[in-house]
């Protein structure tokens, strides 16, 4: 399978690129080449908002869009003339208001999440544009990722505290729930879409 992955050098996109290379897939990564590339990937070196003709005569079995934060990110990629069979957009559970019951369910109301500000709304707008424009589009709304190549010390903190037998405090008198999703589980689930 020929896969285009947006990003490819940091955390989720890097793990995904390396995962699919290890499975024998032909993996192309779209990024600005500002960080080292993973072994076995084919680099498409450019800014996703200024693609020009980088995709002339290119066809992918799958686009795995991990780095789109706004509808403009998706519009720019689609305007490039890229040809593909399926498009998977990694959105976010930030599209659900924090007042929704957790764990979040796909059929819950979406809207502003005061914790995430415009991030969730921008992801919602990107989802809507993609679904209105692309027939074979799939949206995933994962919660907090953790795992290999994590570049921020957030999600690992409670795990580290548990391993080290240290206390950590959960907001809202311990009633605030958080969902975690290992990046390896994301890659394993993608083969079933």
What is each stretch, according to the model?
Residues 35-36, 42-89, 95-98:
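NAD(P)H-binding glycine-rich loop region in Rossmannoid oxidoreductase-like domains
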Residues 191-193:
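Conserved small/polar residues in nucleotide/adenosyl-binding loops
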Residues 3-23:
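N-terminal Rossmann NAD(P)H-binding glycine-rich loop of SDR-like oxidoreductase domains
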Residues 30-34:
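N-terminal Rossmann-fold cofactor-binding loop
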Residues 161-181:
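A conserved pocket-lining segment of Rossmann-fold NAD(P)-dependent short-chain dehydrogenase/reductase
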Residues 127-149:
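Conserved beta-loop-beta element that borders a ligand/cofactor-binding pocket
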Residues 147-157:
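Glycine/proline-rich active-site loop of Rossmann-fold NAD(P)-dependent oxidoreductases
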Residues 76-122, 130-133, 138:
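Conserved Rossmann-fold NAD(P)-dependent oxidoreductase catalytic core, especially the SDR/UDP-sugar
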């Amino acid at each position: 399978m020929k896969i285009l992955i947006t990003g490819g050098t940091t955390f989720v996109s890097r793990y995904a690129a390396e995962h699919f290379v290890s499975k024998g897939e032909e993996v192309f990564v779209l990024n600005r080449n500002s960080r080292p590339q993973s072994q076995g990937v084919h680099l498409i070196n450019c800014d996703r908002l200024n693609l020009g003709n980088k995709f002339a005569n290119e066809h992918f079995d799958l686009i795995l869009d991990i780095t789109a934060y706004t509808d403009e990110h998706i519009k720019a990629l689609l305007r490039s003339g890229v040809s593909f069979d399926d498009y998977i957009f990694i959105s976010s559970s930030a599209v659900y208001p924090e007042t929704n019951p957790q764990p979040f369910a796909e059929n819950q109301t979406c809207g502003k999440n005061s914790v995430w500000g415009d991030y969730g709304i921008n992801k919602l707008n990107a989802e809507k544009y993609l679904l209105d424009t692309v027939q074979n589009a799939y949206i995933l709304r994962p919660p907090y990722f953790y795992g290999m190549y994590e570049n921020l010390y957030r999600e690992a903190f409670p795990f580290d505290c548990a391993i080290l037998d240290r206390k950590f405090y959960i907001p809202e008198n311990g009633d605030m729930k958080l969902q975690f999703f290992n990046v390896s589980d994301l890659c394993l689930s993608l083969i079933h879409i």
